[in-house]
């Protein structure tokens, strides 16, 4: 290989091509590559921000769900307590009403017992008067002996 003028001319042409490429071709390519890198970086940053926002939104949703569950459980517990209180109150009222009915029935039975005893006393007094009348074979005046008959009733 001999070095002659064509090699120098080719070197100069290559150098001019390199300078032309560096001056006119390379800057738009570099600019396009930089813009592309910037877009990719912006896209990655937006994706990271969206991922962070999504995680924050999921966390807020979980917190709100937990709060809602707690409120629901609290409301259910309150409703159960109220229902239990209403049931207990109804039981107490029913028991009280039952006790009143039993007391009234007892009082009525006691009154009927007293009335029956009074009726029996009067019948016994009348029988005693008739028996005494038959024994004595004379008539006993109930109006005259009312005090005696009343004492006889109380003793019976």
Curated annotation (Swiss-Prot):
Record's keyword terms, sorted: ATP synthesis, Cell inner membrane, Cell membrane, CF(0), Hydrogen ion transport, Ion transport, Membrane, Transmembrane, Transmembrane helix, Transport
Pfam entry (one): ATP-synt_B
Record's bilayer topology term: Single-pass membrane protein
The keyword tRNA processing belongs to this UniProt entry's keyword annotation: no
The keyword Cell inner membrane appears for this protein: yes
CC terms in the record's Gene Ontology section: plasma membrane; proton-transporting ATP synthase complex
Transmembrane segments: 7-27
GO molecular function: proton-transporting ATP synthase activity, rotational mechanism; proton-transporting ATPase activity, rotational mechanism
InterPro entries, per the entry: ATP_synth_B-like_membr_sf, ATP_synth_b/b'su_bac/chlpt, ATP_synth_F0_bsu_bac, ATP_synthase_B_chain
Superkingdom of the organism of origin: Bacteria
Subcellular localization(s) per the UniProt record: Cell inner membrane
Gene3D superfamilies the UniProt entry points to: 6.10.250.1580
Assembly: F-type ATPases have 2 components, F(1) - the catalytic core - and F(0) - the membrane proton channel. F(1) has five subunits: alpha(3), beta(3), gamma(1), delta(1), epsilon(1). F(0) has three main subunits: a(1), b(2) and c(10-14). The alpha and beta chains form an alternating ring which encloses part of the gamma chain. F(1) is attached to F(0) by a central stalk formed by the gamma and epsilon chains, while a peripheral stalk is formed by the delta and b chains.
Recorded family membership: Belongs to the ATPase B chain family.
Chain's role: F(1)F(0) ATP synthase produces ATP from ADP in the presence of a proton or sodium gradient. F-type ATPases consist of two structural domains, F(1) containing the extramembraneous catalytic core and F(0) containing the membrane proton channel, linked together by a central stalk and a peripheral stalk. During catalysis, ATP synthesis in the catalytic domain of F(1) is coupled via a rotary mechanism of the central stalk subunits to proton translocation.
PANTHER family for the chain: ATP SYNTHASE SUBUNIT B (PTHR33445:SF1), ATP SYNTHASE SUBUNIT B', CHLOROPLASTIC (PTHR33445)
Designated name of the protein: ATP synthase subunit b
């Amino acid at each position: 290989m001999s070095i002659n003028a064509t090699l120098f001319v080719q070197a100069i042409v290559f150098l001019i091509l390199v300078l032309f490429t560096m001056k006119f071709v390379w800057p738009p390519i570099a600019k396009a590559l930089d813009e592309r890198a910037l877009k990719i970086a912006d896209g990655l940053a937006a994706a990271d921000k969206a991922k962070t926002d999504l995680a924050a939104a999921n966390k807020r949703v979980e917190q709100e769900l937990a709060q809602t569950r707690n409120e629901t459980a609290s409301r259910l517990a309150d409703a159960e307590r109220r229902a239990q209180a209403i049931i207990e109150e109804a039981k107490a009222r029913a028991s009280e009403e039952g006790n009143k009915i039993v007391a009234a029935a007892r009082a009525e039975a006691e009154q009927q017992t007293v009335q029956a005893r009074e009726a029996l006393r009067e019948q016994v007094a009348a029988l005693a008067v008739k028996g005494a009348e038959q024994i004595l074979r004379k008539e006993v005046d109930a109006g005259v002996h009312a005090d005696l008959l009343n004492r006889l009733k109380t003793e019976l």
